[in-house]
UniProtKB/Swiss-Prot annotation:
Residues 24-154 form the RNase III domain. The lineage of its organism: Bacteria, Pseudomonadati, Spirochaetota, Spirochaetia, Spirochaetales. It comes from Treponema pallidum (strain Nichols). This is Ribonuclease 3. Homodimer. It is an enzyme of class 3 (hydrolase). It is found in: Cytoplasm. Belongs to the ribonuclease III family. Gene3D superfamilies: 3.30.160.20, Ribonuclease III domain.
Length: 254
């Protein structure tokens, strides 16, 4: 069921020019959806840099509120999709796969495949700094488009759109074993939750050179996890990343 918010968009935004309306029509063809109110899609493509803080002090005109909503819709649809598609996978495995499926890398790739980058509205400074090609901006715009579609046409329409984007990507993610690479998975989680990268520290090295063992801690945000251990720094880092990921994601087993 649509939330019928077209009047809100029309009150808070200037009318679309004929050129912009035609541009959005072409994008909708690429997306495979049709908006009742194209101003919703226009707002989803409007980056914060387009407006001064005075112009948009309530966040009504740029896309960040839609991004917030789209992130929630995307997460729910992705979780249900994986639950049905992977009936033999346990909760931790599903969570790892989902983290990659809705990551900034995946969403920015989706944005490029749909040519969303061609339709973004950016401020002059952001445009000059290469914002049209920044993964975070592309991923955020993808989530905002999902949120706009939910507002304009309802959950079912948004769900169909998201499933069309995600389903073809589930198998490649599984086949590449990205969900078993705990360092990559932890990096995704750290970026999404803390906007930072995990930092690994060798805290101890034991044994002779021919049989050495490394002990590694990892710091994510302000929290420290570990130690993980292994016969190489790489394997010890993977072990520490697994410990951190399981605790941060709430999948630590007794």
């Amino acid at each position: 069921m649509s939330l019928c918010l077209g009047h809100i968009f029309s009150r808070s935004r200037s009318p679309l020019t004929p050129e912009r309306r035609e541009s959005l029509r072409r994008l909708q063809e690429t997306l495979g959806v049709k908006f009742r109110d194209p101003t919703a899609l226009d707002q989803a493509l409007s980056h914060r840099s387009l407006f001064s803080s005075k112009e948009d002090h309530c966040g009504v005109r740029h896309n960040e509120r839609m991004e917030f909503l789209g992130d929630a819709v995307l997460g729910a649809v992705a979780a249900a999709c994986l639950y049905r598609a992977l009936p033999d996978s346990h909760e931790g495995d599903l969570a790892k796969t989902k983290a990659v499926l809705v990551s900034t890398d995946t969403l920015s790739d989706i944005a490029l495949s749909l040519r969303i980058d061609h339709y973004l509205l950016l401020g002059k400074g952001e445009e000059l700094s290469g914002g049209r090609h920044k993964k975070a901006i592309l991923a955020d715009a993808t989530e905002a488009v999902i949120g706009a579609l939910f507002l304009d046409s309802g959950f079912k329409a948004a769900e169909r759109f998201v499933l069309r984007l995600l389903l073809p990507r589930v198998r490649p993610i599984r086949e590449k074993n990205l969900h078993h690479d705990y360092k990559s998975t932890l990096q995704v989680l750290a970026h999404q939750r803390y906007r930072s990268k995990p930092e690994y520290t060798v805290v101890k090295r034991t044994g002779p050179d021919h049989s050495v063992r490394f002990w590694v801690d990892v710091t994510v945000g302000d929290a420290r996890f570990g130690p993980g251990y292994g016969t190489s720094k790489k394997s010890a880092e993977q072990c520490a990343a697994r410990l951190a990921w399981e605790q941060l994601s709430g999948t630590l087993r007794e």
